[in-house]
Amino acid sequence: MTVIAEPIQRVRLRALATKLRELSKYSSELYFPIVKFVELKMPLLFPDFHLQVMENTYFPPNIHGETVVEERVIRIREDIYLGAIRGVGRDRMTLAHEAGHYVLLVAKGFKFYRSFEGEKPEAFRDPEWQAKALAGELLCPFHLIRGMTASEIASVCGVSEQAAQYQKSHC
């Protein structure tokens, strides 16, 4: 089964990330405080939202978090959450990715479609790509990172070198 979302292009995700940064009073900050955003700002923006930090054994080893639309919750593995607090780039991106799912699925009301034909959706219809792109735009806004190297982006935005390179390629 393939899950397909309503199409949304990067330019709209970029605008949404910019709006979230503005609403959170972090529009010009290179280092976006994702933990503070999820803990303090998301409950103000989305009153039914809550975050649950789960024991590492709650998820299978390769799963770091989940967004459960019906429960209005993001569940994140404890080691990932603690890593995000410490500023570990991959863990910050994971938390931003789950926040991206939440915003797109709960707050924006995007629809899912299921296909049993096994085709891979175009990136702009793939909910994983959408959350990844929104997370990247939130943590590494294009207008602030333009002209920087991937190493500079990773350092000032608090993301992994891989995430920085990916974002740089979309400026």
Predicted features and spans:
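Active-site hotspot residues in diverse enzymes, especially metal/ion-binding acidic/histidine motifs
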Residues: 1-171
